[in-house]
Amino acid sequence: MSALPAVVDDLSAFVISGRVKSRLPAEPGFETSVRTPAQGVQDGVDAELLGFRRVFLAERPELKEPGVILGGIAARTSRLGVATGIVAAGSRHPMLLASLGATIHAAYGPRFTLGVGRGAPAYGHGGHQSYEALADTCTIVKRIWSGEQFEYDGPAGNLGRLGLKDIYEGDPPEIVIGCFGLPRSARTIAETPAIDGILLPAMLTPLGVSRAVAHIRQACDRAGRDPGSVRILVEVPTAPELSEEETRQIVHARAVTYLQPAVWGRSYEVLNDWDPAVLQRLREHPQFTGIDGVLADLNFHRVQLVGPSRLLPDQWMADAAAMGSVQDCVRKLQEFRDAGADEICTYGSTPGQNAKLIAAWRERAEASAAVAVG
């Protein structure tokens, strides 16, 4: 068996982004047009062989239960990190969240990262937790992992007696929260030692990331926390050397799923300086008539959103995603690193489609290191 390449510490990957099907249709189209849970497991194997740091799986209640898919990936790999990206903190009792992390660590080694968020009721992810409840959930899970037995009645609910009789004997998993990094969430991160990092969503531009990073650093300064103790991860859609049509499905159509909901769109307006009028026209597209504010993502597969996506300026997509040649993509990823991101997570495309990109990214790092030494 050939040796695995060195891990690229600042590059991870999402697997089977968005909606999936239980099996491929007779004519699946592009590689990313339709994906299955089984392909997600293989994507994880490919990610390890290519040297990605870890893979993230975004939970969906239909066919993307994270414990199943991440467990399958961990069983077929030896060092690859596996992470939820994200699960709604309110969709599971904290004991179950703690059990998920402890079990994966015990079964496959200390490779799990728990990514949690406040919730998205439209996706069936439970209620929309307050920031206080989210912070308490993270703290509760860390306390359970440490072996504590305790009572809890607070913002996260009246949970009664908590604690695991058998725990993982080693360092606990890290916890990151999925949010935009605006002042309120930045304060939650800074004031909650149990939170180790933030996962910023796809479609933020380098400008948007730099603003989120500034909010987090300022909040840490006010809270007396070392800003360096908060790892900043960002999802970046990547489409290296792919056809224009597949690129539009990966980037433009997926952007609709983030920008159509007003509650998310406003955050992009603030961080990216994007025109609210453009996003309002997107929400008023005839294809969305009658969905009454429900997420377009729940009514249409991404390939069905290419039409509405034409309302989005191409420059917005070029600013927020890595497209074109491999070197074009490398330059774009570097912009996100320069904006303050510690780790980039490729999104929308498969690890295999990013094989040349991770190789070029590794070469860039090695060349920079050689210059520094010389």
PLM region spans:
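N-terminal beta1-alpha1-beta2 module of alpha/beta enzyme domains
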Residues: 1-81, 172-173, 371-374
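An alpha-helical appendage that flanks or caps ligand/catalytic pockets
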Residues: 2-7, 127-166, 207-335, 371-374
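Hydrophobic faces of well-ordered beta-strands that scaffold small-molecule active sites
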Residues: 9-16, 55-57, 81-85, 112-116, ...
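Active-site mouth loops of central-metabolism enzymes
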Residues: 11-38, 85-94, 169-181, 238-241, ...
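Short, acidic/polar
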Residues: 33-47, 97-100, 179-190, 250-251, ...
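Conserved, mostly hydrophobic/aromatic
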Residues: 51, 73, 104, 141, ...
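Alpha-helix-loop-beta-strand connector modules within alpha/beta enzyme cores
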Residues: 64-87, 140, 144, 221-223, ...
